[in-house]
Structure formats: C-alpha cells, structure tokens
C-alpha cells in the first residue's frame, strides 16, 4: 500500500504513487440493502492498442444511451461507448490534464459537454462530436485571480438557468460562477486548512446541482475533509455532511440518490490517506449513506455515521460513477493500472 500525504495531495494535480491493490474478478455481489450490484470488470471492450487510456477520470451518458468516457490520454480524450462496452467513436482535445466531464441539455434540448483540463486551466463547452463552441475565460485574465493564484479546474456543473459553476479543485479552491454565455458572475468557497470551516475547502474536487429539494442547490466535494457542502445558486453556504473515511470525488445525483466514487481511504487502525482503498458510496434523499459497493456496510450510532472503510479490493481508486437509465453503474478509476471502467449490474 502507498500512503498519500497531505502535502502531496494539496501540492499537485496528480499523485505519483502507485497502488498495489488487486481488482477482484467478475461476478461478486457488492453493496447493501436496496443497492446491490454484480461486478463486471470486463465490460469495456476497448483495446489499449487502438484506444489507450491513462486515468479514466469521468463518464456521462447522453439521452440516446451513449456513454462518454473522459481520459487524460492525448490520443483519445473521449471514448464513446455503447452499453455493451463497445467503442463506437473516439475524439480528442489534445489534453494531458483532461479531468472533469459534465453533460447538460439546454432549453432547446440540445446536449453539450463541459470539460476541464487541470494542466492548462482550460474549461470548454463542446458538442457531443467534440467541436468546441465556447471557452470560459481564465480567472486571471479577467481580474478574478491574481497572477499568483493557482487555477486548476477539476469539474463543472450547469444550473437551471444555464449558469456554469467551475470547481477549482486543484487550484485555489473556489467555485467560480459564469452565466450561460461565459460572463463571470462571482466566486465563493475558497481554501481553509482548519478542521471545520463552513463553506471552505480542502480540495473542491467536484460540483453538481442538487435539485432534490424545494430549491436547487450547488453541491460540492471537500475531498480532503470527507465532506459535501451545499450552497445556494448564488453562493451562500447552506450545510455540510461529513462522511468519515471517504475521500469522495464528485457527487452524481440521479433521482433521490447521490453516488460518488471514493478515491482514497483509511484502515481501521490507520487514519492516514491511502491509495488502493477505494469504493463507491450511495446516499439517500436525506443524505444518509445506504450502500457502499466495495466498502463496509454503513453504520450509524446515535445518528452519527461511523468510519467507512473498504471491505474488499474490488476497486483501487474510484474517481467517478455514471448511472445509466437502468440503474446500472459504471465506475471510473484513477491511477489503477490503466483499467477501463467496470460495470456494476443492479441486483437489489
């Protein structure tokens, strides 16, 4: 096993340590309660000779069922797959730091992708075929950041009115808000190294729009703190939920549930941050953990969630979860031997 130091995770977009955990074979059942899944590690039929990947960072699904996998291999940043795992298209932005991928349909129903590059600081909107139709201004170029502020965007989300939220997760830890045409509106969040700091981040890794309540909210990951934060659409802090032991990537909200890939984890007798300890975590409408595929069954005592740990090494370092229209999951992994996504077939 390799420990990930706090200094390493905060100091660089990519971690250089290699996990020694081994993925389990096909067929085992993981998860708990109503969310149990059969693991298929061989679902993806892509071949490294023709469609190589480095890290499989994120995946989204279009309305027509196609799956878009985002990888930081410059030959093919995007692999387009059908639900049988076959590659049906591939294209590239030429990015070495391809990281965050979001899909959104506009008021006319047209779907676009929003992509981030942690290396160059680029954030673009593309067609599903890969044509760039808009690029957001770098915050330093419009006076939002100083020349000394680091900008390394990890994720985007699109609000109900088209506002675009950019998580500067490997940079200065702000959430930056632009309107649908790319005009900068405001920023909120920011970095704090204090153990408890409402609305502040240690690695604002992921962001999504949570429309499960009466009013839509911005939901963002504070990964190093094992927390999710919620804000109003304008950036006012609302609440925090703490998931002890889970270094989550981004929140993926489908129906009443939140899904997230846990990239790093702990041991029962070692609370440091380790690679090879990944699993998937699933929350209900009330943001209580109800299932941990690959992890131990969630336990609450006196209303407090207990430490969550990997149960068996099905996964190395989970970086994202895509939920298809049938409720099956596709798990993307970072720094895990260049494996393609695993499919988890819904059983429960």
Question: What are these model-derived regions, one by one?
Answer:
Residues 41-50, 134-147, 185-199, 290-313:
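Surface-exposed loop and turn segments in beta-propeller and other repeat-based domains
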Residues 69-73, 113-118, 166-169, 211, ...:
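Conserved beta-strand positions in repeat-built beta-propeller and related beta-rich domains
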Residues 24-41:
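Blade/loop signatures of beta-propeller domains
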Residues 317-348:
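Blade-level signature of beta-propeller repeat domains, shared across WD40, Kelch, NHL, RCC1
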Residues 1-16:
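N-terminal secretory signal peptides and thylakoid transit peptides that target proteins
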Residues 49-64, 94-110, 141-163, 194-217, ...:
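Beta-rich, blade/repeat-based domains predominating
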Residues 76-107, 118:
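Blade-loop segments of beta-propeller domains
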Residues 246-296:
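Loop/turn-rich, solvent-exposed surfaces of beta-rich toroidal or solenoidal domains
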């Amino acid at each position: 096993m390799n420990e990930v130091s706090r200094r390493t995770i905060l100091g660089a977009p990519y971690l250089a340590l290699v996990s020694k955990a081994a993925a389990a074979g096909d067929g085992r059942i993981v998860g708990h309660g109503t969310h149990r899944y059969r693991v298929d590690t061989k679902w993806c039929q892509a071949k490294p000779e023709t469609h190589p990947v480095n890290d499989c960072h994120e995946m989204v699904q279009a309305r027509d069922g196609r799956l878009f996998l985002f990888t930081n291999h410059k030959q093919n940043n995007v692999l387009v797959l059908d639900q049988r795992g076959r590659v049906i298209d591939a294209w590239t932005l030429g990015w070495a730091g391809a990281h965050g991928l979001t899909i959104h349909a506009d008021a006319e129903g047209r779907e676009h992708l929003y992509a981030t590059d942690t290396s160059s600081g680029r954030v673009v909107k593309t067609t599903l075929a890969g044509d760039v139709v808009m690029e957001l201004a770098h915050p330093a170029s419009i006076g939002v950041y100083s020349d000394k502020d680091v900008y390394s965007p990890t994720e985007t989300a699109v609000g109900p009115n088209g506002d675009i939220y950019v998580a500067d997760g490997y940079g200065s830890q702000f959430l930056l808000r632009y309107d649908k045409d790319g005009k900068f509106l405001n920023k909120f969040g920011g970095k704090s190294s204090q153990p408890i700091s409402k609305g502040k981040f240690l690695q604002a890794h992921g962001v999504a729009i949570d429309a499960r309540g009466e009013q839509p909210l911005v939901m963002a990951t504070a990964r190093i703190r094992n927390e999710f934060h919620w804000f109003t659409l304008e950036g006012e802090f609302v609440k925090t939920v703490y998931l002890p032991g889970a270094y989550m990537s981004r929140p993926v909200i489908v129906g009443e549930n939140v899904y997230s890939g846990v990239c790093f984890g702990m041991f029962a007798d070692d609370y440091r941050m380790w690679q090879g300890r990944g699993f998937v975590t699933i929350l209900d409408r009330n943001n209580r953990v109800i299932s941990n595929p690959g992890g131990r069954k969630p336990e609450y005592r006196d209303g407090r969630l207990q430490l969550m740990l990997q149960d068996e090494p099905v996964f190395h370092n989970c970086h994202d979860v895509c939920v298809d229209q049938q409720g099956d999951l596709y798990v993307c992994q970072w720094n895990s031997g260049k494996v393609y996504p695993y499919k988890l077939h819904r059983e429960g």
